[in-house]
Amino acid sequence: MPTSLIDNKESSNFLVGLAYKANDIWYDLVEILMQLPGGELIINYIKASHKNDPWRTLLEALLALFAIKYFLASRYSQDDKDNMVLSKKETDELIEDWVPEPVVVDLREDEKWQIETNPILNGAVSKRVDIQQGDSISTNVLNFASLDFLGMSTDKKVVENSVECIREVGVGACGPPNFYGTQSVHVRCREDLAMFLGAEDCIMYGQDFATPISVLPCFLKRGDIVIVDGGAYVGLQKAAMISRCNIEWFNHNDLDDLESILENLSKDLEQGPLNRRFIVTEGLSENFGDSPDLKRLVEIKNKYKFRLILDESNSIGTLGDNGRGLPEVYNIPRSEIEITIGSMARSFGSSGGFCAGDKDMIYHQILTSNAYVFSAALPPYCAVAVSTIIKAIIDEEVEGKVNPHIRPLKENSAYLHSLFNNSKELSKYVTVKSDSYSPSLHLRIDADLREALDLPDVYGGPGSAVTKALKNGNEELFFDQYYNLESFKLQTIINKCVEAKVLPTRTKRILHHEVLPIVPELILHINATHTKQDLDYAYSVVSKAIIDTLEHWRKTGN
């Protein structure tokens, strides 16, 4: 039946009335909104937005409705019918049957010696220490296992200032540097470090191992490239890996190999997208005890437009007339090294790490460095200890002369190296890998003897069994019997030395954490407080222990 004219008019009047009613409601809402703080700003925004793009107004209205529904709705949608209700007996049975995964894999029987032979020091770290290994206690032992190269951690002034700081502000910083962890002594220490190193600014970290792992990812990401020394210690290896950039490795301190890699990359880098490019190396190698030619290294990085990250953990306080590291040796300004990182737990006799360089580079880390943002700041007394040691070194500076705090270490390092290098009998068993200026004397089993003992040249590295285990996720269960055996023999040498009141040390590395090939080493860390008589005695004890142990091994194969 056709609709009448009267029905059409009634429908039209109803719709018109509805429209007027909606209009009145809208204006009432607008008036209410105008009375609210910021309401006029919202209304003007809606008018301008609707005028330029009506569809945008509709989209924003829908988003607003969705947001209201989202926040008012229940956070979780649950159906009680799907919940399983267990009786107490069933719950107890499940708990009893549950076997948790171990936090760490249990040690094998032939690995437990590593735990049992860890020396425990009774008292402060100094030239002579009392140590406990297992059930045995040795007193007044000559310490060649400490990285406190200058021997200043027990200096009277350092101890007094540290104690005074503890009494004033307590032991811990109680928070990250970015929040409430930074105190005045931290600021002074940063200034002292920057001034000592000749850098614009400096930043400090609570842990030295966390320093490279936090600094490198601040400046490297996917698509960037870093070329790392092939002898870098594990901290630099991990730092490069977690930054997720492209990594190239050049042969240890082989600058010809470095330049060859850069030359091969140069064409691709010119054509590819603009990215960040760094070279990473150490001022004094932790694994080899030698240094690169910094002058040529700077020339290479400038030629190929790369930046340089130099880890001076071992070279600060040991190299240069005043202990300012490798740049002081080559008379190169610190500004030529874009990023300098290092440890304060070695020559500075304290704890933590630092990064020095350009102010903008330092400021960038304040907001982007994981360790700086999330980890606790360095304990205040540790910062005071570093500042005190720096002041002591600077106060003794005389231009053109070796600093009195540095000279004994240099002389001791050269002397002990000469004793080991000049021994023809000892050279049949071990090879000195470190250079004479290194305060850490590195000894490796001689290549010919390794072959006679059926030991591999190196352990780990690309293509090795441990690398394959790592790819398969079985690295925790991997065991290298030769690596364990060689490390045990070095520990046997150490045990014999401890019986004679000398404490050397050895490399203690976890094989599956190392990306690069490694070789176990016996190490003597030389101290500025050691006397010539100490060094002579240590040489006689260590050399006898080496010859006795390795000769017995060679003859018996056991």
Predicted regions located by residue number:
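N-terminal "arm"/small-domain region of PLP-dependent enzymes with the aminotransferase-like
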Residues: 2-10, 14-20, 24-172, 306, ...
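PLP-dependent enzyme catalytic core of the Aspartate aminotransferase-like
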Residues: 3, 48-56, 60, 64, ...
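Active-site phosphate-binding strand-loop segment of PLP-dependent enzymes
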Residues: 148, 248, 253-309
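Substrate-binding/gating loop at the entrance of the active-site cleft, primarily
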Residues: 207, 228-245
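Conserved PLP-anchoring active-site segment centered on the Schiff-base-forming lysine
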Residues: 216-234, 255, 259, 409
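Active-site C-terminal subdomain of aminotransferase-like
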Residues: 304-307, 314, 319-449
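Conserved PLP-binding catalytic core of the aspartate aminotransferase-like
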Residues: 401-417, 425-501, 513-533, 539
